[in-house]
């Protein structure tokens, strides 16, 4: 099975190592997911948005090219090819201002384009969108935040799942959507961090083949991930 992981953090995947002032717990979680999936024999492809220098801005040239069935930015075309080849998609990012960082939103805007990853059927009854990613069997979101999980769900009303699941992948017909949230990141101990990373690795080692697997059900953690380490 081919797993595509999209990491969005300015420090890049290199910050997975626990080096003061150059570390990111988001990157450490992403690296643990990669290790687990690879240990299970899955092919793992990593898109490191910051390392690639990906721009989240949809330009006028992008829109003109899209209307002509073309792509201006070769990086966008490369991401689209890799997405179409994926059986399971994983996003890993910190939560800023209660939402994903700009590069992840730009990935949705510029890469998940109509005519490439989904089609729209004018006049269709019900949902007019059709999934053009037949291999993609599931999406897992790994989010890291300082906000308490309960506050995020009940006070802010879960904006991440509304945007990514209900408003994006669910809308175009992708099933098996899973969210793993690591809250209160700055208040966790080194032992809690280690346990969290070990559990994340086991979760993705248990990723089941066929229709994109289901790491949230197969792994050792529940829907939320309460154990984290300092630094988003």
Where are the regions that the model predicts?
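N-terminal beta1-alpha1-beta2 submodule of the flavodoxin-like/Rossmannoid cofactor-binding fold
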Residues: 1-116, 198-232
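Residues at the starts of beta-strands that form the adenosine-phosphate
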Residues: 2, 43, 137-139, 176
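A short, flexible beta-alpha/helix-coil linker loop
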Residues: 9-13, 145-150, 184-187
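Functional cleft and adjacent loop/helix regions within the main domain
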Residues: 69-83, 129, 147, 160, ...
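Structured loop/turn residues at beta-strand edges in well-structured enzyme cores
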Residues: 84, 102, 134-137, 175
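Short, structured loop/turn "capping" segments at alpha-beta junctions
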Residues: 114-119, 174-177
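Short, glycine-/small-residue-rich phosphate/pyrophosphate-handling segment
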Residues: 119-170
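Glycine-rich phosphate/pyrophosphate-binding loop and the adjoining helix
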Residues: 151-232
């Amino acid at each position: 099975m081919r797993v595509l992981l999209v990491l969005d953090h300015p420090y890049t995947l290199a910050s997975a190592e626990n080096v003061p002032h150059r570390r990111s717990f988001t990157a450490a979680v992403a690296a643990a997911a990669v290790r687990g999936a690879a240990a299970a024999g899955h092919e793992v492809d990593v898109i490191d948005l910051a390392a690639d220098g990906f721009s989240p801005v949809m330009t006028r040239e992008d829109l003109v090219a899209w209307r002509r069935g073309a792509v201006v930015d070769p990086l966008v075309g490369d991401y689209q090819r890799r997405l179409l080849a994926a059986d399971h998609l994983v996003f890993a990012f910190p939560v800023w201002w209660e939402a994903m960082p700009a590069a992840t939103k730009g990935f949705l805007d510029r890469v998940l384009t109509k005519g490439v990853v989904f089609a729209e059927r004018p006049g269709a009854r019900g949902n007019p969108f059709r999934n053009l990613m037949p291999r993609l069997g599931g999406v897992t979101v790994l989010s890291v935040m300082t906000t308490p999980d309960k506050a995020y769900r009940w006070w802010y009303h879960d904006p991440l799942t509304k945007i990514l699941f209900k408003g994006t992948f669910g809308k175009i017909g992708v099933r098996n959507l899973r969210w793993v949230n690591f809250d209160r990141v700055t208040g966790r101990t080194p032992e809690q961090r280690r346990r969290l990373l070990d559990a994340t690795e086991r979760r993705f080692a248990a990723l089941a083949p066929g229709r994109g697997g289901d790491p949230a059900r197969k792994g050792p953690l529940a829907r939320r991930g309460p154990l984290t380490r300092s630094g988003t």
